[in-house]
């Protein structure tokens, strides 16, 4: 019994002694308040913490490793010269304020001043100057953009009061960068796992591929089967190399040894025989001959290196460094690579015999997620190597020159290079790393600040590297392996459907941990080193191979014992808590993973049919004595990744625990992500409705943070009076949505009222709107810089201009202050000027001698454009990083709901306002309550949003009881309890009320279902979309009306509309639309030759006798002229009608 206490995961071992003292028939008492573990988890991990953990790992650990790996710079010109990096540090955020003054800065200041929130990267170096050896400390080599809330950030460890002093919202999650004043997020990137064998059928060819990835190299190696023979394929070789040649090149020369690595059973011998004969036919018998054969198949390099190597040396170099780059080679011993290749061959053989052994690319255990830390470390490594290479070339060039001063390498270290590289990568989102041939676009995006939830939802977004245009269902479909790791509802509709995903609530993404300690534990637990055994035991059916991060570690005879011991050590805290151990019985392998980018989540451990977390542990958590990490250290909870979940039996709740159960889910609602967690009773809705709400919840306006009044964003929507929802969910409280809500509780009557509510349109009560329902503020900004130029001229801002006759300020300049900038509080109309800026006509000439007063200036004013007037909220004058004056103006508009504005409930039920009715005409119930909104009942049956009806009931009961009801997923308040509460307060238990018509005053014939529902006002407002045109600007080239609302464009009558008019035979209408109202043009045509004439003169006929005037569209005339220029001459034949 003692050994079983160690947390056994195996089904066979869980047989119990019938004389055991415990009685299994006694049901397990459910733990109360087990969900309190979720907020405890979210304090330390989850949501945005993975971005921050990853970045912290980079600036504290990875950056030191990168500098250590490239610590020495030497020069071929002078053997005594060297530059050695001793240490590297990332400092605290600061900003250069000119005159060599640097001061500490805050993210808010960087947002306002359009600068980058970054910290200096400093190094300690030792180098030689001539014959001296010099040490320098704290030398700046560049600036690192800092992630908000990382370990070096100014906000870390501050209390709410201190954060408010820094103008920062305490609920802001952090995890993004501020680059040139813009908030940028590095999205989580989904990749196929590295260093892992994947067997697949590629156009009928069975192949096993490995993508090796180390710090130095990335390469892809394939073993494939063609015509009954096996080959190895790699990009650096022109042709597939027979596998036996590879074995011989790797030093396994005898055919018997090769066969014993593959397997000595008759099946393996029969399948592998043809490959052995193939090598015999090629006359390859020795390692040297194999290397020469490989050398003849190498791809010719474009740049020949200075030291020319023979083809066989090139081939050996390739085998050592590039093919299977992740398999370690000690001292030119290639045995491990030979063993690895033999395993790949065996995988291909097995898959040929049994088609079920193909690996699934879309299985989520085969994926890794790249976070900001790993992407930035690749970028930094590339820039750092480039800087060192440049220093080396400068040294090579300058040391041989005879100079008065000796060569000093410090003078050539340019900090701007690394700074600009990191900044431009984050601000443009283009990650280009030449060494890995990596070119990615769209890695970063601007943080969406429509609402608090849209910002949070963006931090948990996972971006796939798959092309969006291909209509493939595999990568898009919901995989069973994504259970609990990714949100099943939160994905966009359209082309990105299923490719852009979101993390679930309790998902954690691992960061890399050192594998050395785990290897020592594994060897102590009974793993034998594979290098010390021959090929035969490897193929023994009782022997299991042990892999660590894709590399072969060794083999074991007692795999259950090994797995049990490793898990026991992990639970006792002797090993990292994110190390995963899982068994694959089909491949006879045990995989240990310590790498970063795996998805995992915490589970309660179950032993002997009892969860290890007891009620007294939860009470300690409640009292604040116990933290989430204590549960991990005491071995009560552990993290499982996608692969290890396959080895476990996980119960949904306490009732489902059986004999073989190994783990218990902490809380079912953590299956959903942030956006889907806002929906009350999502398990009562049809699935796509929850998906629609996830998309619309991000467009709902509300509050974006406590500091929203101090921000100057390019576009910001604020709801004037947001409510916390009456029906909450646990996720709403965990994500602080109730503190920064986006919506209002509207009293809704579900009934038909006039014809203005068909197709989901809503009818609003005018009195409610007058009291402030759905009212919002829209903030926009305008900005300009005032620069000084190289020729000593500069921009200037002029005061307002006066009319010469009346001596009054002209209308355009009416809102300007005397300094030429608009004053706060003014109302600005369309085309009025806000900043009266002028710019010198010449900025790039030589400095002007004594004539700076006569420089001609051109006016480049910043004016207001918009159909409705705005108010100036604030004007800010500052300076940005380039020492230019920066002026920002914040404009405010108050929008009142009008017909055509879009609203939606939290169940994917969207609709526009169809009619606004006076309160006198609205129906009212016998308590005198008048609804804010009337919704058509036809929105319910086909949509099956039962969650909405439950929300209405719960909200109504909550109002009467004075409490919030919970509509948490897979739980929440029970309908029976809600109905009992309604009955207790004298209301009908099904939520229907007795209503009177507001128009006639008589009772309505049916009872009306009514109560409060949480409605969101969406950003789509009719004022921003409404567009019509009678006359306006035309395009220069075609003389047709311009296109688009912003350019006052026309509405195009397209090909389909034209076809429709042709089918009606409305020829005069076609002519009026397509020519007269668009681009009619009179042109002269010669009746003799059919060409166009000019001024009644035909140039071709040299005559004006037969020239007529006709009308045609200008675009048609242009087409004829363009064709003529290409030697295609259209001729027009004219007839009289």
Curated annotation (Swiss-Prot):
CDD domains, sorted: RNA_pol_B_RPB2
Enzyme Commission (EC) number: 2.7.7.6
One GO location term (cellular component): RNA polymerase III complex
GO molecular function annotations of the record: DNA binding; DNA-directed RNA polymerase activity; ribonucleoside binding; zinc ion binding
Residues reported to bind Zn(2+): 1086, 1089, 1098, 1101
GO biological process per UniProt: tRNA transcription by RNA polymerase III
Chief location category: nucleus
Intracellular or extracellular location(s): Nucleus
UniProt xrefs under InterPro entries: DNA-dir_RNA_pol_su2, DNA-dir_RNAP_su2_dom, DNA-dir_RNAP_su2_hyb_sf, RNA_pol_bsu_CS, RNA_pol_bsu_protrusion, RNA_pol_Rpb2_2, RNA_pol_Rpb2_2_sf, RNA_pol_Rpb2_3
Assigned keywords, A-Z: DNA-directed RNA polymerase, Metal-binding, Nucleotidyltransferase, Nucleus, Transcription, Transferase, Zinc, Zinc-finger
Catalytic activity: RNA(n) + a ribonucleoside 5'-triphosphate = RNA(n+1) + diphosphate
Superkingdom of the organism of origin: Eukaryota
EC primary class: transferase
Zinc fingers (C4-type) by residue: 1084-1099
Described function: DNA-dependent RNA polymerase catalyzes the transcription of DNA into RNA using the four ribonucleoside triphosphates as substrates. Second largest core component of RNA polymerase III which synthesizes small RNAs, such as 5S rRNA and tRNAs. Proposed to contribute to the polymerase catalytic activity and forms the polymerase active center together with the largest subunit. Pol III is composed of mobile elements and Polr3B is part of the core element with the central large cleft and probably a clamp element that moves to open and close the cleft.
Assembly and interaction partners: Component of the RNA polymerase III (Pol III) complex consisting of 17 subunits.
Family, per entry: Belongs to the RNA polymerase beta chain family.
Protein name, entry field: DNA-directed RNA polymerase III subunit RPC2
Annotated source species: Drosophila melanogaster (Fruit fly)
């Amino acid at each position: 019994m003692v050994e079983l206490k160690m947390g056994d995961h195996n089904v066979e071992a869980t047989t119990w002694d019938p004389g055991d003292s415990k009685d299994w028939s006694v049901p397990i008492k459910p733990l109360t308040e087990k969900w309190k573990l979720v907020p405890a988890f979210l304090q330390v991990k989850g949501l945005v913490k993975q971005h921050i953990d990853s970045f912290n790992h980079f600036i504290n650990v990875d950056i030191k490793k990168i500098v250590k790996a490239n610590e020495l710079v030497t020069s071929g010109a002078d053997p005594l010269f060297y530059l050695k990096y001793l240490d590297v540090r990332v400092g605290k955020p600061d900003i250069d304020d000119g005159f060599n003054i640097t001061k500490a800065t805050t993210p808010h200041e960087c947002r306002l001043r359009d600068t980058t929130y970054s910290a200096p990267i400093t190094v300690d170096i030792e180098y030689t100057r001539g014959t001296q050896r010099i040490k320098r400390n704290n030398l700046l080599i560049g600036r690192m953009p800092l992630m908000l809330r990382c370990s070096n950030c100014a906000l870390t460890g501050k209390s709410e009061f201190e954060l408010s002093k820094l103008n920062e919202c305490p609920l802001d999650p952090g995890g993004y960068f501020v680059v040139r004043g813009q908030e940028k997020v590095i999205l989580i990137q989904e990749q196929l796992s590295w260093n892992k064998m994947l067997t697949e059928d590629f156009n009928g060819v069975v192949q096993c591929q490995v993508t090796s990835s180390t710090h130095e190299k990335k390469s892809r190696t394939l073993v494939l089967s063609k015509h009954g023979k096996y080959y190895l394929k790699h990009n650096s070789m022109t042709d597939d190399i027979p596998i036996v040649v590879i074995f011989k090149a790797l030093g396994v020369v005898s055919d018997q040894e090769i066969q014993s690595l593959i397997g000595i059973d008759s099946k393996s011998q029969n399948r592998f025989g043809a490959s052995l004969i193939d090598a015999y036919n090629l006359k390859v018998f020795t390692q040297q001959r194999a290397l020469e054969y490989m050398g003849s198949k190498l791809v010719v390099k474009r740049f020949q290196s200075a030291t020319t190597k023979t083809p066989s040396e090139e081939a050996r170099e390739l085998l050592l460094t590039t093919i299977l780059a992740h398999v370690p080679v000690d001292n030119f011993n290639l045995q491990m690579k030979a063993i690895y290749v033999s395993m790949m061959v065996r995988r291909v053989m097995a898959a040929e015999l049994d088609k079920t052994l193909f690996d699934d690319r879309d299985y989520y255990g085969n994926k890794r997620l790249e976070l900001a830390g790993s992407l930035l470390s690749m970028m930094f490594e590339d820039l750092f190597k480039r800087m060192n290479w440049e220093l080396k070339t400068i040294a090579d060039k300058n040391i041989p020159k005879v100079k008065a001063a000796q060569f000093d390498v410090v003078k050539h270290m340019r900090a701007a290079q690394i700074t600009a590289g990191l900044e431009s990568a984050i601000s443009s989102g283009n990650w280009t790393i030449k060494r890995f041939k990596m070119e990615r676009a769209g890695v970063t995006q601007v943080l969406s600040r429509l609402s608090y939830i849209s910002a949070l939802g963006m931090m948990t977004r996972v971006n796939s590297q798959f092309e969006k245009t291909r209509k493939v269902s595999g990568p898009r479909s919901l995989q069973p392996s994504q259970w609990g790791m990714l949100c099943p509802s939160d994905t966009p509709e359209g082309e990105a459907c299923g490719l852009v995903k979101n993390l679930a609530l309790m998902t954690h993404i691992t960061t890399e941990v050192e594998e050395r300690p785990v290897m020592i534990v594994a060897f102590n637990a009974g793993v034998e080193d594979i290098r010390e055994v021959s090929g035969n035991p490897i193929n023994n059916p009782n022997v299991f191979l042990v892999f660590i991060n894709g590399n072969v570690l060794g083999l074991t005879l007692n795999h259950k014992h090994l797995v049990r011991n490793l898990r026991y050590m992990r639970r006792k805290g002797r090993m990292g808590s994110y190390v995963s151990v899982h068994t694959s019985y089909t491949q006879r392998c045990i995989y240990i993973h310590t790498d970063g980018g795996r998805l995992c989540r915490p589970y309660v451990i179950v032993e002997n049919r009892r969860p290890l977390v007891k009620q007294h542990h939860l009470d300690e958590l409640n009292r604040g004595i116990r933290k989430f990490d204590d549960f991990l250290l005491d071995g009560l909870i552990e993290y499982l990744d996608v692969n290890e979940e396959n080895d476990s039996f996980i119960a949904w709740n306490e009732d489902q625990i059986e004999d073989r159960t190994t783990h218990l889910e902490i809380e079912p609602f953590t299956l959903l992500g942030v956006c889907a967690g806002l929906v009350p009773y999502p398990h009562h809705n049809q699935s796509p409705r929850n998906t629609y709400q996830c998309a619309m919840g991000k467009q709902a306006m509300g509050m974006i943070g406590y500091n929203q009044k101090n921000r100057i964003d390019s576009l910001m929507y604020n709801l004037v009076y947001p409510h916390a929802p009456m029906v909450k969910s646990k996720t709403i409280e965990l994500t602080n949505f109730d503190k920064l809500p986006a919506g209002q509780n509207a009293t809704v009557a579900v009934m038909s009222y006039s014809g203005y509510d068909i197709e989901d349109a809503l009818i609003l009560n005018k009195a409610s709107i007058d009291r402030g329902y759905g009212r919002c503020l829209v903030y926009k900004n305008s900005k300009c810089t005032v620069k000084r130029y190289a020729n000593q001229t500069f921009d200037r801002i002029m005061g307002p201009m006066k009319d010469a006759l009346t001596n009054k300020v002209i209308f355009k300049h009416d809102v300007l202050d005397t300094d030429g900038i608009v004053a706060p509080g003014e109302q600005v109309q369309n085309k009025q000027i806000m900043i009266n800026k002028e710019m010198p006509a010449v900025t790039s000439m030589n400095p002007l001698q004594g004539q700076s007063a006569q420089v001609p200036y051109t006016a480049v004013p910043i004016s207001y454009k918009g159909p409705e007037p705005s108010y100036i909220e604030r004007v800010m004058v500052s300076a940005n990083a380039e020492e230019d004056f920066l002026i920002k103006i914040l404009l405010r508009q108050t929008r009142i709901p009008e017909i055509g504005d879009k609203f939606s409930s939290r169940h994917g039920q969207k609709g526009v306002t169809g009619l606004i009715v006076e309160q006198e005409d609205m129906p009212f119930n016998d308590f005198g309550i008048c609804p804010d909104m009337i919704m058509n009942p036809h929105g319910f049956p086909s949509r099956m949003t039962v969650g909405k009806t439950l929300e209405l009931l719960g909200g109504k009961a909550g109002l009467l009881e004075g409490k919030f009801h919970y509509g948490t997923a897979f739980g929440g308040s029970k309908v029976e309890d809600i109905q009992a509460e309604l009955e207790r307060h004298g209301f009908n238990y099904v939520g229907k009320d007795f209503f009177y018509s507001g128009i006639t005053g008589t009772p309505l014939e049916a009872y009306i279902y009514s109560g409060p529902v949480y409605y969101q006002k969406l950003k789509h407002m009719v004022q921003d979309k409404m567009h019509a045109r009678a006359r306006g600007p035309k395009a220069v080239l075609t003389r047709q009306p311009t296109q688009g609302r912003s350019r006052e464009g026309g509405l195009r009558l397209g090909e389909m509309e034209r076809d429709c008019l042709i089918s009606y035979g409305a020829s005069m209408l076609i002519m009026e639309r397509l020519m007269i109202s668009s681009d009619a043009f009179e042109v002269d045509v010669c009746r003799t030759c059919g060409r166009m004439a000019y001024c009644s003169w035909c140039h071709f006929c040299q005559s004006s006798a037969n020239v007529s005037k006709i009308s045609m569209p200008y675009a048609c005339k242009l087409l004829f002229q363009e064709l003529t220029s290409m030697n295609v001459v259209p001729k027009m034949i004219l007839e009289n009608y």
